[in-house]
């Protein structure tokens, strides 16, 4: 009897889940790319699941097989973007030894990161204050990371003796985070260049820290 040749049956069966997983991942990535394009072009409210499916060359069923709804899609994109933003900020601030300089550098890195993605930033602001999905966007894990970076810099300022021990760090973290966000609308709606945002942020950081600086 002639022995069988070729791929053993076990290996063939084992490879099937891998191929399925790869195909599912590729489909998911294709949907995300199409959704990013639609959100940037039409805004969050304007883009529909049908638009996204058409742009991806898929059925709406294929989109729903990967995401529960439009907000799920948008939050996935936003969380990925903010994770990349946090990484860019961490790289930018490495080596900074002064709290004011470090915070200004963090903010500047953020503005430059989004300079080429302002339509997505506009969509994010639109979703962030909707009653249905705003709380989800505002509480993304990556945004909590961003706030934690601000807290870390304030705590480092206290440890170095730049700031007083009673610096009300939670309050100042919240104020500085809101300041960081407040500079996006001038860029989105009025075309402010990164240099203008940086100058504005520098003054804002200085004012917020003024009451906590050691004499």
Functional labels for PLM-detected ranges:
Residues 83-86, 116, 134-160, 170-174, ...:
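Amphipathic alpha-helical packing segments from all-alpha helical-bundle domains
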Residues 112-116, 152, 156, 174-195, ...:
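Amphipathic C-terminal alpha-helical segment
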Residues 61:
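Key DNA-contact positions within bacterial/archaeal DNA-binding proteins
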Residues 76, 90-119, 169, 173-176:
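Hydrophobic alpha-helical connector segments
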Residues 25-33, 45-46, 57, 65-90, ...:
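An amphipathic alpha-helix adjacent to DNA-recognition modules
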Residues 115-134, 185-189:
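Amphipathic alpha-helical segments used for helix-helix packing
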């Amino acid at each position: 009897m002639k022995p069988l040749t070729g791929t053993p049956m076990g290996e063939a069966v084992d490879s099937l889940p891998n191929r399925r997983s790869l195909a599912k991942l590729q489909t998911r990535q294709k949907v995300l790319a199409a959704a990013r394009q639609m959100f940037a072009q039409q805004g969050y409210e304007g883009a529909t699941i049908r638009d996204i499916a058409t742009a991806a060359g898929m059925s709406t069923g294929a989109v729903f097989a990967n995401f529960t709804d439009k907000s799920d899609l948008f939050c996935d994109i936003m969380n990925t973007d903010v994770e990349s933003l946090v990484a860019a900020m961490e790289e930018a601030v490495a080596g900074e030894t002064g709290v004011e300089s470090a915070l200004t550098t963090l903010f500047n890195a953020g503005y430059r990161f989004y300079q080429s993605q302002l339509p997505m930033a506009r969509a994010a602001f639109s979703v962030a204050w909707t009653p249905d999905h705003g709380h989800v966007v505002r509480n993304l894990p990556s945004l909590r990371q961003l706030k934690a970076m601000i807290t870390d810099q304030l705590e480092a300022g206290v440890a170095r003796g730049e700031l007083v021990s009673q610096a009300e760090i939670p309050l100042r973290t919240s104020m500085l985070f809101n300041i960081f966000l407040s500079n996006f609308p001038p860029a989105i709606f009025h075309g402010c260049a990164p240099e203008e945002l940086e100058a504005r942020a520098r003054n804002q950081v200085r004012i917020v820290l003024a009451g906590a600086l050691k004499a």
